[in-house]
């Protein structure tokens, strides 16, 4: 009984993650959904941790994270890019999310995300990744034991030209046109509909 409830809730979380990927993909919705759905379902159990609701990630979360990093890092980049989209109603603690690879003993370089997402290195979207990585490195360095050499971190940073004062802080970039905004609003309605379906199944179970 309890196992079935957990599976239902994990499926609901996975639906949100998949929706995030589909929205970020734009014209390549079908292709990106096909590539990322399985990996994101595997990471569904990470959501309680990166939202600050769990003290540590589950073994399944770490396994799913490593699979995404090894098979398609682009999917992880999309999750980071869309982490604060208000239309999706999904809030992620950036510090916990970026520290997740280290906690799971995995290696992930988010400074590669702009290239994987085909972003201009000097664009605001790209600068978000560079500054988040820089902020993580500074946090790790500050927490290193005194008198001992700090271990190399899995995140590296590239200096940006337009976001030098936003290190480690959450940054959101507004949409470029009305069509993109309408698309996100429609996607939000779809996610809500999915939740009602999952909630109904959850009650029946």
From Swiss-Prot:
Glycans are attached at residues 93, 137, 165. InterPro entries: Bifun_inhib/LTP/seed_sf, Bifunc_inhib/LTP/seed_store, LTSS, Plant_nsLTP. Pfam families: LTP_2 (PF14368). One of its GO terms (biological process) is lipid transport. One of its GO terms (cellular component) is cytosol. Residues 141-176 are annotated as: Disordered. Residues 178-205 form a propeptide. It is a lipid-anchor; GPI-anchor. A lipid is attached at residue 177 (GPI-anchor amidated asparagine). It is found in: Cell membrane. Disulfide bonds join 36-77, 46-61, 62-104, 75-113. Induction: By abscisic acid (ABA). Gene3D superfamilies: Plant lipid-transfer and hydrophobic proteins. Residues 1-24 form the signal peptide. Expressed preferentially in expanding leaves and sepals, restricted to the distal side. Expressed at low levels in roots and stems. Its main location: membrane. One of its GO terms (molecular function) is lipid binding. Keywords: Cell membrane, Disulfide bond, Glycoprotein, GPI-anchor, Lipoprotein, Membrane, Signal. Probable lipid transfer protein. Belongs to the plant LTP family. This is Non-specific lipid transfer protein GPI-anchored 13. It comes from Arabidopsis thaliana (Mouse-ear cress).
